[in-house]
């Protein structure tokens, strides 16, 4: 009887448990489905979390992608990173009270964190990084999560002070709060974490002193506090007691003072990053006690003295970065003996004497950069002994002798920069065949001999051999350099004709072959090289005429053929070259009259001086200088009249024939139009493909540029659209992902992004359809007749709006989108003068996609290109930031980025030069010296504030520039003084 009762009791308990488990299981499924609906948002793809569907099964939800359950079918883990999702976290997340791991990283989730998160008391791992969560971080919500070990909120939009409640989480080991907008100082209480091993607070807006009490974190192994924080004072010497530290990063955070010798006690440290600060004094020799050290970066400070000899004990060192300091003396011989050294960067110091001849003999050297020092002697022969060396950077020194032959056999090399030395001899021919080299710069040396007839560097983007003693003919084999963008052969002794093959290179942008002994005509292939932005063929003995079709070079900014023997009339078509800002045809044999109108209004008479038979509108006599006029006089009046009659008859007949053919072709075109063109819409459009194509007429053209020709199209329903006909981007079988990428761009929706409505395509052409912007581009307003009407308040507003558009591309798109061609002409204004960023993501499609599948090397427009592009041939978000900084300078100064400051000087260089010329330099004095004279009644503090942001954006080093998110934050929240109008300037 007793056993029967026990059995019944157990059965009853089992059914109770089963009912509870069933209810909990179905509750979890219901919560997951609500979670899906909220997290997807309106922009997510239809297949996002597609398998999260209701199914009448207790365990169905446990098979959802990214979901893990325990034995009781309760959800214990969710990982939905990289979906992407565009919604928010709903309150229902709190119902999943058995969750131990919640990972929603790499999405576009927005809003504030729901207070219901506090119910997740079992949570051990919370990762919400790489989203757009905002507001103050709710530390009180996290406080009940007493089991939490990992908290990662990197790259969001959290503001306010750092959450102090987190110190009560006794099991917390990993805390990553970087990449937000936290402000204020680091709380002293952060020294009270019990178990913390990883702490990263970098890339915020923190200030104050770094608390020395952080040294009490005895379990800490990783500490990162730098990057765009701005602390007061220096490195706390107490940090030397943190014996468990393996990684210490205090870079780019305004630290001053000397490096504490007490850091030598960190014997377990393998990484020490102190770069981009204001540290002074010498490098402490005591740091040699850090025998575990592998990476040491002290670059971009004000350190003095020599490299300590005691550093010979750092046998594990792989990276030694000391560049941009004031270090002096010689490089000790032990540096060449460090067995693991891979990176040695000492550039921009005061080092001197001969480099250790044993450099590279360790067999691991990859990156070697000693640019801008005072080194003498020979280039070490064994730099590439390992076959791993990627960069040789020795520009601006006093090296002599030849380049070692071993360098010509170093197939791992990607960059050779050896300009401005005293090197001589014949350059090893193997250098011009290295498969991976992207840059060869040998300018301003004493090299001689001929270039090898065989050249085949398939990756070479920059070839600079200027100001040497090279002789012989320019080899046609240059045509093999399909990635070449810059070719500088000026100031040598080359002879013969310019090989036409040079201008068949699909990516060529800059050509300088001036100052040689070249003869013959300018190759006609020049007019096909539509990527060109600068051409200098001056100081040669070229003859013939400027080739017809020069107007095809729509991106050309500089064209110099002065001091040659070129003849014929000045081409009329130059008037249509709107990008051309510098033209020099002086000292040639041009004849006739200089055309007027169009772009000719930009050029002065100096551009045409030294041509005896050429006159301008001010210097021409009444009689024409054209030879045809003299011929007409010799024919007499009767002959001239007869000729005119014949010409008129022929013209009328030809016109009638053309009209008939045109009518026939138009009818035929309309019949076939719908069959040859296809419209792909990204939203509801009330027009057809043939309506778009009908607008491709000369009279509808509203712009031409590197991205193609832009037409204004009026659709039958009354809608106006902008139609961009892309250059060199076909849509046939070999479109190299064009359709996929354009469709991705078509899904982008932001108030300050020019909306892509759809595209029309056939086998040869792609037409992109955008919303029409009636007020044109910012460039037109700044540099055209309208500039005087663009008041300061409007300029500032446009800057904020454009920054928000770029910020969206960089931080809110997944994957992020690099614009690649930020400029004032790509910031368009709608009817309310609201800014819209245009042409984003198009730069990679501007060249023939069949020529190369490597499109990432297209950098942007002349004057906007970041300086590091010359070294890397790559662009990233910080390249866009630099270009945006140039746009900010345009808004302040009102001048184009190039062409108005003298040869070789752009707007950034001019501003820096102006600063140096001021008797009493200050921000106010500099702004008053450069500000647009058309501005009046502007608040000086506001202009200074935006000017300082612009100068942050155009810093020479990419890592030192702010992100676009930081730019938006700064522009949107100026200090109180910058918004006041008490300091108005009237000019």
Curated annotation (Swiss-Prot):
It comes from the Eukaryota. Residues 1-23 form the signal peptide. Belongs to the protein kinase superfamily. Ser/Thr protein kinase family. GO terms for cellular component: membrane; plasma membrane. Keywords: ATP-binding, Cell membrane, Differentiation, Glycoprotein, Growth regulation, Kinase, Leucine-rich repeat, Membrane, Nucleotide-binding, Receptor, Repeat, Serine/threonine-protein kinase, Signal, Transferase, Transmembrane, Transmembrane helix. GO terms for molecular function: ATP binding; protein serine kinase activity; protein serine/threonine kinase activity; receptor serine/threonine kinase binding. ATP binds at residues 702-710, 724. LRR receptor kinase involved in the regulation of root and shoot growth, and root nodule organogenesis. Involved in long distance nodulation signaling events. Involved in the autoregulation of nodulation (AON), a long distance systemic signaling from root to shoot and back again, which allows legumes to limit the number of root nodules formed based on available nitrogen and previous rhizobial colonization. Acts from shoot to root to control AON. Glycans are attached at residues 79, 101, 108, 127, 157, 254, 265, 278, 316, 350, 512, 517, 552, 560, 622. It is found in: Cell membrane. Expressed in roots, leaves, vegetative shoot apex, and reproductive floral apex. The active site is at residue 821. PANTHER family: LEUCINE RICH REPEAT FAMILY PROTEIN, EXPRESSED (PTHR48053), LEUCINE-RICH REPEAT RECEPTOR-LIKE SERINE_THREONINE-PROTEIN KINASE BAM2 (PTHR48053:SF131). Its EC number is 2.7.11.1. Coiled coil: none annotated. It comes from Glycine max. This is Leucine-rich repeat receptor-like kinase protein CLV1B. Residues 696-985 form the Protein kinase domain. The keyword Signal applies. The chain crosses the membrane at residues 645-665.
